[in-house]
Every structure is written in C-alpha cells, then in structure tokens.
Amino acid sequence: MTRPGSDIRVILFDLDNTLYPPDAGLIEAGDRLIADFIARRLDLPWDEADRLRVRLWLQYGATARGLEVEYGIPQREYFTGSLERVDVSRYISPDPDLAELLGSLPQRRFVFTNSSELYAERVLEALGVRGLFEGVFHIESSGGRPKPDSHPYDVAVQATGEQPQHMALIDDTEANLGPAAEMGMLTIKLGEAPDDPRHLHLIDLHDLPGLL
C-alpha cells in the first residue's frame, strides 16, 4: 500500500509547539511578554491587553498583524518589544532525538512560521537543529502577512521551486493547514485530531516517517 506522503519532496515545519513540545513553557513566556507589550503600548490593564492579544491572534493569524492593522503598530516594534525579549534557552535545549529525526528524512526541510526571523533562528539554535533546515520562512519573508493568509504559502512554493503536490505542511494549528490543502499540499495536523478530513493526524512528531 502506498503511503500518503510517498511522493513528498519538501516538508514545511511549523515552529512553535511543533518542533518542541507544548509543555516547554516557551509559548506561555512569549504570550506574557506580548501582553506586557500591548499593555504598555496601548496603556491598557494587563488582563485587557491579554484578551486583546488572543482576539487579534484568532482574527488575523498573528497578534503582530492585528496590532499593525488596527492600531498602526509596526510589526518590527512588536517583535522587538515582545517575543525577541524571550530567553529561549530557559525553556528549550538541544534535542538529539529531534535532530536524529530530521536528519533521517530524505526530503528538503524548511521552517514555516509566523514569528520573526530572529526569534525563529534563536529557537532553532537552542534546539540544536538549525543546520538541518535548508531555510526559514518567517513573517519578514512574507511581507508581514501571516498564516493563514495565502501569501506566505505562495512565497514558500515559489522559493522552494517545488509543486504543491510534492510538498507537506506540519502544523499544530488547524487553521493554518487549510490554505496548504487548497493548494494541493499534504497537510498534517500535529497534536489534537483535526476536524477537517483532508488533514492527516500525527500525535507525535517522531512518528512522521511512517507517513512519508
């Protein structure tokens, strides 16, 4: 029987909560700093700032984009004042098992994230896997337009030079998989089971070779 991903040549990996486990604490640390930034920048009570953070993330795919659209706050100011202040080494460390998994995959590998280039590079270096990826697609490379906007996916397809039918996307956020599936990519939901039957389900990233 042919495996669903047997003709995949390029794999796009989401970054946060995909290349490291959700219980690492890094996401929570970043969320606190984002709420801190919003509270300072908009002169809001912290709880209100945190609720705004969540609403903008749900509505725009990235809080940075929402703050830019609704409040005119440059994304560079947002990242400098929030996520790029996180000491990622407090939450994640070199992961030999992840490195072994990535190194065993014959496909070309890229990171596909809504975070900034600097933050993504720091996370990959902390995990000890930067050299195992051909490149990183980040918020700057998509012109500030985050997943699930269609533009980042178009950028990734053009930059890799591969047909979507030969590409796979792995993401823990189901909303980010829809545009990839529409393009013809193999889409893999990590963590909780997907609602959309187009997406494959993967509980543990280390089981990925069984799908490919």
Q: Model segments located where?
A:
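A generic structural signal for short
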Residues: 23, 52-53, 90, 108-109, ...
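Asp-based, Mg2+/Mn2+-dependent phosphohydrolase catalytic module
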Residues: 1-9, 99, 103, 110, ...
